Every structure is written in C-alpha cells, then in structure tokens.
Regions:
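Conserved structural motif at the start of ABC-family nucleotide-binding domains
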Residues: 3-5, 18-20
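Catalytic Walker B motif of ABC-type/P-loop ATPase nucleotide-binding domains
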Residues: 140-144
Length: 206
C-alpha cells in the first residue's frame, strides 16, 4: 500500500459529498476514480494530497506525493525554466535532468525559455504535470490531467503514465469519463459521495 483512504467523509453545509470512502492505491499501479461532475472526485483528491482536512476518516501515505490539480497554478510572468528552478529548490533536487526528460516525453522542450503567459492551455498543463512529477514521487495524484491535450499529447500522457508505473510508482487518475478504463489496473466509481467496489482490469496492463 502506497496510499490509503479510510472512511473519508466530508460535507459542504448540509450536502455530504464523501460518505465513508475507503480504498487503497497499491505500489506500481495505475488506478482510476471516475464519476459525474459533483460526485466528490476533486474533494477526494484534495483530501488525499493534504490540501483539505476531511470531516471524518484518515489517510495514510508511504513516500513522496506528486499532485497535479485540475486548475493549472502557474505564474504568467515566469518562464518554464524559472518554474522548474523554483521547484528544484522546493523539492531539494540536485539537478533538473528528470524534469528535462519529462519535457522531452511530453514534447514541449522547445518552450523552456518562454513565459507562461504565451503558452497554450495544453502546454501549461504539460508544465503542471512536469512539476508534479519532477521529484519522482512514489504516488502521483492527477485531477483531469489531460484536459486541453490534443490526441498526440493524450497518447504521450499514457506512455508517460506507463513509464512511471514501470519505475514502481503509482498513479491515481481522477476523471469524469471511463473510456480510459482499459489503460488502468484498477477502476473505482464515485457516485454521490459513495465509492463503489473497485474493478481490477488485468488485461488493461499495457
């Protein structure tokens, strides 16, 4: 177990958005949580990453965490390189070699010295993902990670996810769509705050 949620509950006013959510993310796995808008997916992810305290229940994390939120949080005045240098210090990294490798995989290395203000939404999301991964976390939490991606970049994303899994890392993908199910090792469905029995997709390992 790399990440575990145990009986998580949360409410906004009288509206209960998480109702005793319990599940585990095993090592070296691609895990998906799908559900309609308003099902509680983003709230769940915010609790798992420590951004939001649950009203009830606990989480357990074994190792480093990477988090790629749905809303890209970048500074328009900074270049891509400046963002990487900032997080190099924040993560305590000796160098940026893995970050540069991620940029090559995601095909945006040519934008290294461009300011974020001139980047497209898809390229911003690539930078967001690179920042979440550049310290090689044991578990990566992704909230609708491929929004704004074209088809080629979408495929590159899944290639990267498989590479991360091959390194023994775990990836948890939150999405409102289930058409990526065949790419996942486990799939959970969140419906009105209730997490339904997971499905193990053995043939989905790619």
């Amino acid at each position: 177990m790399v990440l575990k949620a145990n009986q998580l509950r949360h409410s906004y006013g009288r509206r209960e958005v998480l109702r005793g959510v319990t599940f585990e993310v095993p090592p070296g796995a691609l895990v998906g949580v799908v559900g309609e808008n308003g099902a509680g997916k983003t709230t769940l992810l915010r609790i798992l990453c420590g951004e939001l305290a649950p009203a009830g229940g606990t989480t357990e994390l074994d190792g480093r965490l990477g988090y790629c939120p749905q809303q890209v949080v970048l500074n328009d005045a900074f270049t891509v390189a400046q963002h990487l240098e900032f997080f190099q210090v924040a993560y305590g990294l000796a160098d940026l070699s893995y970050a540069y490798e991620l940029m090559e995989v995601l095909n945006f290395a040519d934008y290294l010295h461009d300011r974020v203000s001139v980047l497209s939404g898809g390229t911003r999301q690539k930078l967001n993902l690179t920042i979440a991964l550049m310290h090689d976390p044991e578990v990566l939490l992704l909230d609708e990670p491929y929004q704004g991606f074209d088809w080629e970049t979408y495929l590159r994303f899944w290639d990267l996810a498989r590479q991360v899994r091959a390194r023994g890392r775990s990836v948890l993908v939150i999405s409102h769509l289930a058409y990526d199910a065949e790419r996942l090792d486990e799939l959970h469905r969140l419906d009105e705050g209730v997490l339904h029995t997971s499905t193990t997709i053995h043939e989905g390992r790619c």
